[in-house]
Amino acid sequence: MSKPSNTEVTIAEAESVKEEKKIKLILDRAKDHGKLCPVRDIIHRISDKWSLLSILTLGTHGTLRFNTLKKEIGDVSQRMLTVTLRNLEEDGFVSRKIYAEVPPRVEYQLTEMGQGLMQQALQLADWANTQLPQIISSRNKFIKNK
């Protein structure tokens, strides 16, 4: 096996420094905003059982009415979907449009920011699918060593 060239080492070091700076910036922002850490706050908000499913479903289907969205997601209760959509709307990921009709019609769709979040969620899902065999292997080794 050959030694890495000076150029390869320099590029790797530069990437490492860039990542360290990015992490430091994120952690410094958390300190500057007191208890509002942007990473912790957003991850907490979207890591519940229904938020990402709602975002991915709206991203796949576009504009949906409440009952259609509920049906597409599956076994979510009406109350939990209502709470989830309110939280996503409050954070600016989902928009809600109410039509003055009888019966009332309410439609939901992703905002531009919600579409951006969906793209990030898809990258995470791709990574998880790629890493799944290794994760399962690690879990099995951990269980055997307990």
Where do the language-model regions lie?
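Canonical helix-turn-helix DNA-binding module
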Residues: 64-99, 103
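Alpha-helical linker/hinge and terminal dimerization helices associated
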Residues: 56, 91, 120-135
